[in-house]
C-alpha cells in the first residue's frame, strides 16, 4: 500500500492547476524516489512533468512502484478547501484508487475524499536529452507579462542569447516587440555557454508562462533549435517542468 503526506496542500493545488492547463487526466506515479506525473500532448509540442522528490514528503510509505490514473478535477475539489499555508495533504492507496485527506495543522480541521483511479505500471515517458547552452532564472510574473506582450503582436517568438543578453522578439504586420533580459535586469542568474537561437509558438509559451506565477525562481533553458525547458519550483519542494518543442 501507499501513503504520502506533503506539507503544503496549497502548493499541491497550484501544481495540479498547472497540469490542468495541459490535460485533465494524469497518471500519478509512486516510486522509491518521488511522486511524479508526465504528460505529452498529442501534437508532441508540449511536455509537462509534475514531481515531488521523496525528501520533501513528510511521510512516505510504498510497498512497490505503482501508477494510478486519476482525474485532476476530482483531486482539486478537496484541495481547493486548503485556504491556509498550514494545510497538509495526504494520499493513501485504496482498492478503488486514492483517499485524499486535507488537514489544517493549526485548527485540526480535516476533509476527506475518495477518488476512483485505475492502477497501472509506471509510465515510461522520458524527458528530451539535449544540451541547454543558455539558462536564466527570473520571477514567474515577469515571464507572464512578457508572454502577454508578445501575444499582442505575433504568433512566433524568437529567443536568442549572445554575450550578456537574452532577447525575445516577434514581428508581424509591420509591428515589432522586443524584450531584453540581462543579469539583475531583471534576471537573477544568467549563463550563456554559446550564442543560441530558437523559435517557439507564442500561444504555447503564453499558456506555460501563466503557470510560472506560482514561483519567484523560474529557470528557463534553451539552445539552437532545441526544446525549451522551464522549471517552476515551489517553496515546499514540489515542481513543474515544461518542455516546449521549437518551430523549425
Curated annotation (Swiss-Prot):
Q: Which UniProt keywords apply?
A: DNA replication, DNA-binding
**Which InterPro entries does the entry mention?**
DNA_clamp_sf, Pr_cel_nuc_antig, Pr_cel_nuc_antig_C, Pr_cel_nuc_antig_N
From the UniProt record, give one GO term of the biological process aspect. Answer: leading strand elongation
Molecular function terms, GO-annotated: DNA binding; DNA polymerase processivity factor activity
Superkingdom to which the source organism belongs: Archaea
Coiled coil start-end: none
Q: Which CDD domains match?
A: PCNA (cd00577)
Q: Subunit info?
A: Homotrimer. The subunits circularize to form a toroid; DNA passes through its center. Replication factor C (RFC) is required to load the toroid on the DNA.
Q: Which family does it belong to?
A: Belongs to the PCNA family.
Function, as annotated: Sliding clamp subunit that acts as a moving platform for DNA processing. Responsible for tethering the catalytic subunit of DNA polymerase and other proteins to DNA during high-speed replication.
Against HAMAP family, the record matches this protein to: DNApol_clamp_arch (MF_00317)
Q: What is this protein called?
A: DNA polymerase sliding clamp 2
Q: Which organism is it from?
A: Sulfurisphaera ohwakuensis
Amino acid at each position: 500500500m501507499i501513503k504520502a503526506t506533503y506539507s503544503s496542500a496549497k502548493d499541491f493545488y497550484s501544481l495540479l492547476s498547472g497540469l490542468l492547463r495541459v490535460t485533465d487526466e494524469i497518471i500519478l506515479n509512486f516510486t522509491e524516489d518521488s511522486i511524479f506525473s508526465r504528460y505529452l500532448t498529442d501534437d508532441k509540442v508540449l511536455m509537462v512533468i509534475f514531481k515531488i522528490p521523496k525528501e520533501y514528503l513528510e511521510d512516505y510509505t510504498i510497498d512497490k512502484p505503482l501508477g494510478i490514473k486519476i482525474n485532476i478535477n476530482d483531486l482539486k475539489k478537496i484541495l481547493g478547501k486548503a485556504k491556509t499555508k498550514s494545510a497538509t495533504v495526504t494520499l493513501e492507496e485504496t482498492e478503488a484508487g486514492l483517499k485524499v485527506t486535507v488537514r489544517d495543522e493549526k485548527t485540526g480541521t480535516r476533509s476527506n475524499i475518495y477518488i476512483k483511479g485505475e492502477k497501472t505500471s509506471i509510465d515510461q515517458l522520458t524527458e528530451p536529452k539535449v544540451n541547454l547552452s543558455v539558462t536564466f532564472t527570473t520571477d514567474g510574473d515577469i515571464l507572464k507579462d512578457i508572454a502577454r506582450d508578445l501575444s499582442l503582436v505575433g504568433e512566433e517568438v524568437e529567443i536568442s542569447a549572445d554575450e550578456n543578453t537574452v532577447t525575445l522578439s516577434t514581428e508581424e504586420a509591420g509591428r515589432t516587440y522586443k524584450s531584453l533580459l540581462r543579469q539583475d535586469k531583471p534576471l537573477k542568474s544568467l549563463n550563456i555557454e554559446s550564442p543560441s537561437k530558437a523559435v517557439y509558438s507564442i500561444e504555447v509559451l503564453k499558456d506555460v508562462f501563466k503557470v510560472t506565477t506560482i514561483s519567484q525562481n523560474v529557470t528557463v533553458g534553451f539552445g539552437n533549435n532545441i526544446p525549451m525547458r522551464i522549471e517552476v519550483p515551489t517553496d515546499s519542494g514540489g515542481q513543474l517542468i515544461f518542455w516546449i518543442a521549437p518551430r523549425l
